[in-house]
């Protein structure tokens, strides 16, 4: 019998047949698949757009998008780009097919294209089918953010250790620390906060809130909400009760430590929305106050008293402030120094202030005089007025001249814990004639900065920087109380200095004798209407506006015609940030002594009819008056020296320019103009007084010619901004005329290829360039090496450099620069910028050296450093930034 074989041939044929059918279907069904792909992609895009609108609403409420949803959005964006390419080639590919779509003139190419269409169709269908019930979550925040701290007070280490251990005890939910003003409670609480920041101690989040004397529940709620990532319109529209419920529901799920600094009365935690820290582990509250009674009302059984320093410890602190040079300048001074230190009663604030005041007193006679002055203000009863204020008043009395003293008292007009812009203070001082401005505003400003420096060095003011180059000062609350006490003639004439700033009052306070009121501050309040007439015959300052960093917007709407009738000495009137104020009464003409008028961020459209009678006015602020249509009548203000029009909507017609050119005493002008405002750009007089100039608008052929004239027209220009202009280059020349320029901001300028003109600004401190898609160089080598420019080394004083969305930028400078003052380089979306003009010696040196920031870690990996030493110097200071 022969051997036979059976081969299963049919299944193989079947599989091959299926494979061939699938390949043929890619081409045969191409048109149907393309139509389905286009339709399904439209549906996917509609779904994405709906979800993105929902995402925008939820992110406005402080929520953050889920990573899963972001991956989906990225996938949709990726597949959309691919499909755009596929659909672009559809006609070519369809024409390539033949034999009823079963074959192709290029079979391989058609197969690949058809397969890609088929696979993308399946991918789009899958993306479209994904369901998102939730796309956001509660925004995550850093657990703790370290707070800036003054140097540790000598002798507080033991108390800090004790407070930290006490707060961490299982049975302690609330810890209160009390003591007199200036004893170091805030410093101790800050050290405690930073200690928790370092160790975390198992808590999810730490929250710091300054409460201050005028306690407002919603203010505390808003600060806690900000830390929790809440915000937007939905939050601000909630009432106090709703905010409390919202905070409670979030905090009850977290372990937290809440630090409340400077409370003056019982704080109702339930009303704020803070779960009771005593009811569950993982919740802690630490606060400071001046009153032991407040501790008891807050439910603290064993409050910690922050006591003044013991005599020997206090003397150690005092000696450090005085310095060994002064202590050793005469054999008798150390013994007298111990007597002076003893008069400070161990109060750290007084020891610091008096010690620094005495640091330059190097004769026995000066020290004996100091003891005599301190003894002349004996303390007779417990409290601020009998112990702290007389001591602080000695530092006040020791200030040189009434000018510096009056300047300090003026700072007390601002709200408690206020950050006060230095330039605002100085403007007020000049117009109140505390500083003589007769020799020019710039000289007067220099004097103002000298006074501020004197007060800072005397520890009566503290400097504060907002990180954006705008410097401010703040006043310790004890020093502020001292200033108010002195201004009211040691409490005898309390109505001379009326300060109700930032406390939420809704009407003008009731005053027994308006004739004694000299200065009044009602800034950052809720007063809607000023009605009636008040006989304020001695009133020189009236503040009804808001600070730059104020938290409460002024709400003034109307001023009655008779309100200004009896204020013949009023020199300073601040109505800034009253965004519901549309006009001023004609009777403002009665303010015959007015020198300063601030209408910043108001809604006025015209100057009041009585403006021409204000013959003494020297300072007029109309910045951000977005409805301003005319300044007719301003030519009557013959003594006007400072006019601020930045970001106002004033139309720059010929009449406006002519009227301004008649102001013969004008020294400082800030303004925003459209390049089409040829009349302004052609005015040598106005350009020569420009301190801040912003050019905004579209391209004009004459813009460069006017910019060239600008370079020879002004030596006062400090801030220069060009925004949304189409211009190939900025032609400026003349190094001698840009010595004052410190801030340059260029935004959204099409066609701009280089900024070589910046070599003529040797004092520039901040340079920001955003959205200049054609920019290739900051300083162009070829242009910079032409003529006189070849010997100039740019940016010797530059502090901050920001470069954002400059896709063609390749070079900042062609070789390393010293950059001796450079603190920060912020770079975003500059893919072709791979080499920085740095070597190992560039940038600000020391512990707080130059920082380089970018949002993309791959950019750092691609940087071409000058050498290994440069890489070693700067790579550790490179920081990733996250954009919300």
Swiss-Prot record:
**UniProtKB keywords:** ATP-binding, Coiled coil, Leucine-rich repeat, Nucleotide-binding, Plant defense, Repeat
Show the GO cellular component annotation of the record.
Answer: nucleus
Can the keyword Thylakoid be found in this entry's annotation? Answer: no
Q: Where are the LRR repeats?
A: 569-591, 593-615, 616-638, 639-661
Q: Which amino acid positions bind ATP, per UniProt?
A: 179-186
As recorded in UniProt, coiled-coil segments are: 20-70
Cite the NB-ARC domain residue spans from the record.
Answer: 136-440
One GO term of the biological process aspect: defense response
**Ribonucleoprotein: present as a keyword of the record?**
no
Q: Which InterPro entries match?
A: Apaf_helical, LRR_dom_sf, LRR_R13L4/SHOC2-like, NB-ARC, P-loop_NTPase, Plant_NBS-LRR, WH-like_DNA-bd_sf
GO molecular function terms attached to this record: ADP binding; ATP binding
Q: What does this protein do?
A: Probable disease resistance protein.
The family this protein is said to belong to: Belongs to the disease resistance NB-LRR family.
Entry remark concerning the domains of this protein? The LRR repeats probably act as specificity determinant of pathogen recognition.
Could you tell me what this protein is called? Answer: Probable disease resistance protein At1g63360
Upper classification of the organism = Eukaryota, Viridiplantae, Streptophyta, Embryophyta, Tracheophyta
